[in-house]
Each structure stands twice: as structure tokens, then as C-alpha cells.
């Protein structure tokens, strides 16, 4: 005896008490919007989002959607080839504009990310400048030297900008930028010193580590002398201990070329020479 079962699948209905709202563009849609599927997010949609973000009035409005993501901020970015807008994280947007931001301790993982980004941008267009923004304490010796050597090996010119602090090897990278394109903000602080190590083990191991550290120190100081125009003897003497610079002192020493002054304070800010101006 054959027994057949007739079953009917019913899609669950949405209760109005759920208060579900979906947004298409900048206007709220009813829950029935689910039945028709999501609309195609095209150029017009992203254009409305971008215009909304640009012309926000700050007034409370139920129909206005303010996207405030948790974690890495996302921004609208226009694809130049396709002419469409899309949401990307802020670091991705900066990379696409050839901007590299170093705002943390430089370790092996972070250094590899910076190296890969610089090499990729150089292969895309080696005639356009890469902009490196620095606001960090420096980092490990070998990863920082890898960034320096890569900067010098690229065909693309690399400009450097200090937007807060550039300590130790971050200051060394700041001075390694293209001449004429090394900038700092008025309140930037730069500190340089001799590289340090923490050798442990047998006496021979410690001695070998000290020799290697001295070799790297000599290389760093000689390169810094070339980049700043200072005599090597002065660099060795000045950096035997921590030496700190403000923006004006960094210009005098040759670490940077100009001080970037925002337009709102450009007229009121004191200037000591012609090189201090809007970058």
C-alpha cells in the first residue's frame, strides 16, 4: 500500500510588530520589500549616498540614514574606470589614492603590508608620487630598514609627511623622502637616536650582536647624513643620545623641507623663513 504525503511549504509572513525596515538609497522601505529582492545598488544609489554625506545639515531627520560602522570606518569611493561609487574601508581608499599611513609600531607583519602596497603602486604607475604619512613611534630595526630600502628602490617618487610624531626609525623614514616633498605639521615632533638592542646569551653571541648593531648604526647615520646634508661627524655626535626636533628645528637640520600650515592659521602663524609655508 502506497501512502502519499502532500505537504505545502508556506513562507513565513512578516509580522508588523517586528518593525523591520530596509533602506533603498536614503528612504525607508516597508517590509514587503523583501518579497521583490534587493534592488541593484548602482551608480545612482552611491551618488545619492555620497551627496548626502557631503551636504549633511546635522538636523535630526527620520528619513536620513547615517552610516556609522563599528571598527574600521568605511567611506564612499568612486571607481574611475567604471564611474561607480562603492563603500570601502578608509585604508583601502587611501591606498587607491597612493597614500600610505604608518601610524603604529613597525613590526614584520605591518612592514610586509607596507612593502607589498608600495611595490603594487609602483607597478601600476611609476610616474606618480606615493605619499607616506607618519605618526608613530618607529619600530623594529629590520622591518623598518626593509621599508627604507624599498623606498629607495622604487621608480615612483615617495613624499613623506609627519602629522604628529615621528620617533626613532619613523623619523629616519621621514628624512628619506624625496627632496622638496618632505613635510611636517606645525606641532609635529621628531626624535632620533642610536639604534638599541637587547642581546642575551654567551659572551661571543653578545659580542657578535654588538658588532652587527654597530654596523647598522653606521649605515643609518651615514644615510641620514646624505638625506639631511649634515656632516656625518655631527650626526654621530648628535645622535649618541636622544635628539628631539620641533618642526622649525627639523627644517634647519634638513629632516624636512616645508611646514604645512592649514589655511585657517596660515596668516596668523609665525614664519621664520620662506621655506615654511603651505605645502
Swiss-Prot record:
GO terms for cellular component: chloroplast; chloroplast envelope; chloroplast stroma; chloroplast thylakoid; chloroplastic endopeptidase Clp complex; extracellular region. It is found in: Plastid, Chloroplast. Induction: Repressed in darkness. It comes from the Eukaryota. Disruption phenotype: Embryo lethal. Delayed embryogenesis and albino embryos, with seedling development blocked in the cotyledon stage. Under heterotrophic growth conditions, seedlings develop into small albino to virescent seedlings. Its main location: plastid. InterPro entries: ClpP, ClpP/crotonase-like_dom_sf, ClpP/TepA. Disulfide bonds: none annotated. Residues 1-54 form a transit peptide. One of its GO terms (molecular function) is ATP-dependent peptidase activity. Expressed at least in leaves and roots. Gene3D superfamilies: 2-enoyl-CoA Hydratase, Chain A, domain 1 (3.90.226.10). GO terms for biological process: chloroplast organization; proteolysis. It holds the Pfam family CLP_protease. Keywords: Chloroplast, Plastid, Transit peptide. HAMAP family: ClpP (MF_00444). Required for chloroplast development and integrity. Involved in the regulation of plastoglobules formation. Belongs to the peptidase S14 family. Component of the chloroplastic Clp protease core complex which consist of at least 16 proteins: CLPP4 (3 copies), CLPP5 (3 copies), CLPR4 (2 copies), ClpP1 (1 copy), CLPP6 (1 copy), CLPR2 (1 copy), CLPT1 (1 copy), CLPT2 (1 copy) and 3 copies of CLPP3 and/or CLPR1 and/or CLPR3. The core complex is organized in two heptameric rings, one containing CLPP3,4,5,6 in a 1:2:3:1 ratio and the other CLPP1 and CLPR1,2,3,4 in a 3:1:1:1:1 ratio. This is ATP-dependent Clp protease proteolytic subunit-related protein 2, chloroplastic.
Amino acid at each position: 500500500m502506497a501512502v502519499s504525503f502532500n505537504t505545502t511549504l508556506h513562507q513565513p509572513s512578516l509580522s508588523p510588530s517586528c518593525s523591520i525596515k530596509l533602506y533603498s538609497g536614503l528612504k525607508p522601505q516597508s517590509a514587503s520589500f523583501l518579497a521583490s529582492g534587493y534592488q541593484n545598488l548602482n551608480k545612482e544609489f552611491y551618488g545619492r549616498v555620497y551627496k548626502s554625506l557631503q551636504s549633511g545639515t546635522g538636523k535630526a531627520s527620520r528619513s536620513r540614514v547615517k552610516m556609522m560602522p563599528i571598527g574600521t570606518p568605511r567611506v564612499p569611493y568612486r571607481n574611475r574606470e567604471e564611474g561607480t561609487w562603492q563603500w570601502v574601508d578608509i585604508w583601502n581608499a587611501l591606498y587607491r589614492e597612493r597614500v600610505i599611513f604608518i601610524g603604529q609600531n613597525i613590526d614584520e607583519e605591518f612592514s610586509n603590508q607596507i612593502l607589498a602596497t608600495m611595490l603594487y603602486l609602483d607597478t601600476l604607475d611609476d610616474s606618480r608620487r606615493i605619499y607616506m604619512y607618519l605618526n608613530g613611534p618607529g619600530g623594529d630595526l629590520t622591518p623598518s630598514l626593509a621599508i627604507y630600502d624599498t623606498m629607495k628602490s622604487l621608480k615612483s617618487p615617495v613624499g613623506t609627511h609627519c602629522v604628529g610624531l615621528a620617533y626613532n626609525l619613523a623619523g629616519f623614514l621621514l628624512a628619506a623622502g624625496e627632496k622638496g616633498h618632505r613635510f611636517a605639521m606645525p606641532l609635529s615632533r621628531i626624535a632620533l637616536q642610536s639604534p638599541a638592542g637587547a642581546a642575551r646569551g654567551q659572551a661571543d653571541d653578545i659580542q657578535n650582536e654588538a658588532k652587527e648593531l654597530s654596523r647598522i648604526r653606521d649605515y643609518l647615520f651615514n644615510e641620514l647624513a646624505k638625506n639631511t646634508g649634515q656632516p656625518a661627524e655631527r650626526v654621530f655626535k648628535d645622535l649618541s643620545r636622544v635628539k628631539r626636533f620641533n618642526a622649525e628645528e627639523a627644517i634647519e637640520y634638513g629632516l624636512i623641507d616645508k611646514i604645512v600650515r592649514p589655511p585657517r592659521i596660515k596668516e596668523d602663524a609665525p614664519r621664520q623663513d620662506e621655506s615654511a609655508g603651505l605645502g
